[in-house]
């Protein structure tokens, strides 16, 4: 398992390095170099993630039936091809097509990687291993963001094209690294519906609750920077300091927090506590607009992000345990693909929702958002118990049938 973990971590680190460089430069590349409007970029990326969300379950099912390692390798190659194709984009329609291909490949790759992890790692260790991969991912994103920052400083067409080349090369490299892992045999063909997760209402509820909790992502990446610039006296460089604090917190503490989650009861409690901590973080962010001292505002914001990091660590550790444990072992791909749609939906719907809520309503909006986090956290334990009862009474329809 030690060698497999190192290989999984290396693949995650390489891919996320490319992601980090792409994420910090893509908007300016599409607007400044390609010449599209901000609205066109927003619509295209939203459509891309929407298509990706729809593709997650069938691609996860493909990983179950054909073997997750091979499917993950192919989808990493597809992601590399999609990123490279952005070089050819000159107008909006091709941009939408490539964005859809990119979103599909990325979402499917995530599902296949989770299925691969489930196939290589014993159930008792999956959450801890997933936490290690998350730490590697955040480290890679930080390195990639630094590379992207260099391209932003140069601000030339060649620099942005170099970022796309680096991103494509990173996913190509990740595919080659994944080939070093042992093959996980395909799951046996089973009786019952092919995409069983689409009929699993308790799992759908758990996924919905997790999606609400995942609104912390656009909160941190979009709303907090806007709030700092428009509603507080803090200097704009505070944004970088807050993102650095978040990244460092995840890299340093995610594995430690995940070690405390051992089973569904611990996982449910972890998500519930995450909701409470996120409520506190929203309250602190709201307070940062009071007063005119830049240093006081900055200190309050740092306290808010520290709370947000704790909530993120608790949420991630609990959600991973829940998503793996409630999924049948022979359907991990499609179940992880479905659970992963929460990330795509939060990225797709979160910016507009939170901008209206927080930037439109101010302090009241922060309170409403915090109560949303609290409500979702409190709802998770009974939802998990419902799903667990459903697993206990499921008839033996998942036995393998001869093909």
Predicted region positions:
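Conserved MFS/SLC helix-loop-helix module at the cytosolic interface between two early adjacent transmembrane helices
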Residues: 53-90
């Amino acid at each position: 398992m030690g060698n497999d973990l190192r290989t999984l971590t290396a693949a995650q680190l390489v891919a996320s390095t490319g992601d980090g460089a792409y994420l910090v430069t893509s908007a300016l590349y599409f607007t400044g170099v390609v010449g599209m409007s901000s609205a066109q970029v927003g619509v295209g990326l939203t459509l891309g993630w929407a298509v990706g969300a729809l593709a997650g379950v069938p691609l996860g099912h493909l990983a179950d039936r054909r073997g997750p390692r091979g499917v993950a390798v192919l989808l990493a190659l597809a992601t590399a091809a999609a990123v490279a194709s952005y070089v050819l984009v000159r107008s909006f329609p091709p941009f939408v097509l490539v964005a859809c291909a990119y979103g599909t490949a990325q979402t499917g790759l995530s599902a296949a990687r989770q299925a691969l992890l489930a196939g290589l790692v014993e159930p008792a260790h999956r959450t801890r291993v997933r936490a290690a991969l998350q730490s590697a991912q955040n480290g890679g994103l930080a390195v990639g963001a630094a590379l992207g920052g260099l391209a932003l400083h140069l601000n030339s067409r060649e620099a942005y094209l170099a970022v796309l080349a680096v991103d494509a090369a990173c996913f190509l490299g990740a595919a080659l690294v994944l080939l070093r892992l042992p093959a996980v045999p395909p799951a046996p063909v089973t009786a019952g519906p092919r995409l069983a997760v689409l009929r699993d209402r308790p799992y759908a509820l758990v996924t919905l609750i997790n999606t609400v909790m995942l609104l912390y992502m656009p909160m941190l990446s979009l709303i907090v920077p806007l709030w700092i610039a428009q509603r507080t006296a803090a200097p704009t460089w505070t944004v970088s300091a807050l993102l650095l604090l978040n990244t460092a917190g995840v890299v340093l503490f995610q594995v430690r927090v995940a070690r405390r989650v051992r089973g569904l009861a611990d996982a449910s409690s972890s998500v519930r506590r995450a909701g409470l901590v996120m409520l506190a973080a929203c309250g602190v962010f709201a307070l940062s607009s009071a007063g005119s001292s830049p240093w006081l505002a900055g200190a309050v914001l740092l306290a808010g992000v520290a709370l947000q990091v704790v909530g993120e660590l608790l949420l991630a550790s609990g959600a991973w345990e829940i998503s793996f444990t409630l999924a049948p072992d022979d359907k991990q791909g499609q179940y992880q693909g479905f659970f992963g749609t929460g990330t795509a939906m939060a990225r797709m719907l979160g910016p507009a929702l939170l901008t209206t809520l927080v930037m439109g309503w101010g302090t009241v909006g922060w309170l409403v958002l915090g109560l949303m986090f609290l409500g979702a956290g409190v709802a998770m334990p009974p939802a998990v118990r419902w799903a667990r009862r459903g697993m206990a009474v499921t008839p033996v329809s998942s036995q393998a049938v001869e093909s």
